[in-house]
Amino acid sequence: MIRITERYIETEQTPVIAGVISLTYDERKRGRLRAKTQSGEDVGLFLERGKTLLDGDLLMAENGDIYTISAAPETVATAQANDPRQFAQICYHLGNRHTPLQIGELWVRFQPDHVLEDLCRLYGLDVVRESAPFNPENGAYGGHSGHSGHSGHSGHHHGHDHSHEQSRQDAKELSARYHFHAPDHEHPHGHVHLHAHPHEH
């Protein structure tokens, strides 16, 4: 197994790439990981914890070889907005949940979550689940990646309970505007379901 122990500091000279390592977002948050290159070589990552690897990052192995990181396709939820105002609203509310977000041209992408997907639909966005590379914004959230001794899912779970409560509050606040009713109970699986009922005026 090839041991990869440090990030490569780029110089003016273009490095020779020995291999490409494709990793999902949760895998890129981990400092210790066994993986394979796209050509099938076994590699082990032994890196400083707490810094999420980004698509295109270069790493150096103990033998001096340079490897590049590629964001692997994974299941994601992509929400498409119809106009800039709608887009700004959903970015604001999703941002309040401290969830990793990839932001595009009037679309946002996040890890699958029924609560967040329902919230996007509540604001009128079209939501689809698809397979695509996930490259969230590397802002303040990046400093929280990978707590010591936790699995790669710890960062996502940390804000999940909070998103449930926030979604219930949002549903109540928006019920008059969008004619949605939010039930006071929770279903066994813990997700809030927003039921729309037609109103006569």
UniProtKB/Swiss-Prot annotation:
Keyword Chaperone on entry: yes
Gene Ontology, cellular component aspect: cytoplasm
Biased composition (Basic and acidic residues): 162-173
Disulphide-bridged cysteine pairs: none
MF annotations from Gene Ontology: nickel cation binding; unfolded protein binding
Biased composition (Basic residues): 190-201
A UniProt-annotated Pfam family: UreE_C
InterPro entries for the chain: UreE, UreE_C_dom, UreE_N, UreE_N_sf
Superkingdom to which the source organism belongs: Bacteria
Swiss-Prot/TrEMBL keywords: Chaperone, Cytoplasm, Nickel, Nickel insertion
Annotated compartments: Cytoplasm
Region (Disordered): 136-173, 182-201
Record's function text: Involved in urease metallocenter assembly. Binds nickel. Probably functions as a nickel donor during metallocenter assembly.
HAMAP family linked: UreE (MF_00822)
Protein family: Belongs to the UreE family.
Protein known as: Urease accessory protein UreE
Organism, scientific name: Hahella chejuensis (strain KCTC 2396)
Source organism phylogeny: Bacteria, Pseudomonadati, Pseudomonadota, Gammaproteobacteria, Oceanospirillales
This protein's encoding gene: ureE
